[in-house]
Amino acid sequence: MLRDVDLTVRAGSVVALLGPNGAGKTTLLRVAAGLLTPTEGRVAIGTDEVTRRRPSQRAREGLCLIPEGRGIFPNLSVRENLLLQVPAWKRGQSVEPALEAFPVLRERLGQTAGSMSGGQQQMLALSRCFLSDPKVVLLDEVSMGLAPRIIDEIFDALLELSRRGVALLLVEQYVSRALHVADHVYLLARGSVTFSGAPTELDESELMRRYLGGDELEASATN
């Protein structure tokens, strides 16, 4: 359950959402994407409120979610996965622009997505997102289980996206990586924001205390 969460992701910024398991990070992404409807509050893309709009409607507004499971179609080819992401009014356009960040996919356009490595599948998920010309990208553990070299490639592509003005909100298991790329950090614990600020405002001891819910543990011990 989320409580009194006020979160802003500005165009071109990279915002990291950190916290222990069960803190509400994935729930927050699902609310933003329209997969869950909040009982209170609002979700907006720019000045356009989208709280009651379906996920497909939010996607047309420029929101793209890359879930932890990557959200690709394993039985379809790479090319078919990409073509499915092309908006109806752009049908017939080339998928080539989506491959610029990950040239390795050019060699695998006819290959089924499920037969590729985990890193290549994540590259495909990102390429699908890039094709939709997103304004906001929500990323849930994009580096999960990937080799360091692949993680570097993926984050290079994401940072290039942010330089083009796309807003990024990421849930990331590697805290040091998240702090390195983020402009702003939110820490969640038990559904509430316990910290909001620049990565440089967090020292390691404070980060670990907040990340592990230290404030709440201390309060419980006092009582």
Predicted region positions:
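The feature captures the beta-strand-to-loop junction immediately N-terminal to the Walker
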Residues: 18-20
